[in-house]
UniProtKB/Swiss-Prot annotation:
Region feature Disordered, mapped onto this chain: 1-34
Species the sequence originates in: Bos taurus
Compartmental location: Cytoplasm
PROSITE patterns listed in its UniProt record: ACB_2, ANK_REP_REGION, ANK_REPEAT
Name under which the protein is recorded: Acyl-CoA-binding domain-containing protein 6
Quaternary assembly: Monomer.
Length: 282
């Protein structure tokens, strides 16, 4: 469910360790921005580098792809301006953290660092040589890769299931399905997550309210023993935590690691609310 670095079927090779979320690119240790000749246009070189990278993905580590992704976003979008991905979207969070770590880095710096990594991957690369097209292109992935790394997976309407509509916060569709098809509001996905888990994870408060109105099991636990309250707490949605508590959520339920909802959050306000609620019920 996490958005991938690459199109379906692509691989990135051995990452050689944990992915880095900042300027430390793993295989790109202490890399300095290259000197760009005055006669060359930096944006033009950047676009050529992005195009050339299509044929280098198989030799790039995951750390390098993450490093490149962050700088591509910094150039094309600017400073990180999107919410942190959901609790269990591991790849999405790594990508977001890498981009976020660039802070106010200038597009110029990001372009130079991007070009430097492409040169590191292929020291023989000559920006003046035209890239191979069509069947000659050594992409191995059926099309451009890094130039569109940041695009989220698009699911065709006919391929969507009820959980996809939940992630999209499509309240009308979910309500219609529950009403007309007598769907079990507590049905689970392969990880044991219900619609309520998903709605809490994504911060869809109105949808949470609707699901509770249709008698969603507020204390249902997923395959790891986590309740919707664990998800809302971990994602630091204070308003949803409050709503769940007011609706009867049990803050004393532990997951398989023995953690209470108050122990999976980094938000002091959420922790305090959960502790106060537990104390008040004692």
């Amino acid at each position: 469910m996490a958005s991938s670095f690459l199109p379906s079927g692509a691989t990135t090779g051995d990452s050689g360790g944990e992915l880095s979320s900042g300027d430390d690119s793993g295989d790109v240790e202490s890399l300095q921005s290259p000197k760009i000749e005055a006669s060359r246009s930096l944006p033009e070189l950047f676009e050529k580098a992005a195009e050339h990278l299509q044929g280098l993905v198989q030799v790039a580590s995951r750390e390098q792809l993450l490093y490149l992704y962050a700088r591509y976003k910094q150039v094309k979008v600017g400073n990180c301006n999107t919410p942190k991905p959901s609790f269990f979207d591991f790849e999405g969070k790594q990508k977001w953290e890498a981009w976020k770590a660039l802070g106010d880095s200038s597009p110029s710096q990001a372009m130079q660092e991007y070009i430097a990594v492409v040169k590191k991957l292929d020291p023989s690369w000559n920006p003046q040589s035209p890239e191979k097209k069509g069947k000659e292109a050594n992409t191995g992935f059926g099309g451009p890769v890094v130039s569109s790394l940041y695009h989220e997976e698009i699911i065709r309407e006919e391929d969507k299931d009820i959980f996809d509509y939940c992630r999209e916060n499509n309240i009308d569709h979910i309500t219609k399905v529950i009403k007309t098809k007598n769907m079990d509001v507590n049905m689970k996905d392969e990880e044991g997550r219900t619609l309520l888990h998903w709605a809490c994870d994504r911060g869809h408060k109105e949808l949470v309210t609707v699901l509770l109105q249709y008698r969603a099991d507020i204390n249902c636990q997923d395959n790891e023993g986590q309740t919707a309250l664990h998800y809302a707490a971990a994602c630091e949605f204070l308003d949803i935590v409050e709503l769940l508590l007011q609706s009867g959520a049990d803050p004393t339920l532990r997951d398989q690691d023995g953690c209470l909802p108050e122990e999976v959050t980094g938000c002091k306000a959420v922790t305090l609310m959960l502790q106060q609620h537990t104390t008040g019920k004692a």
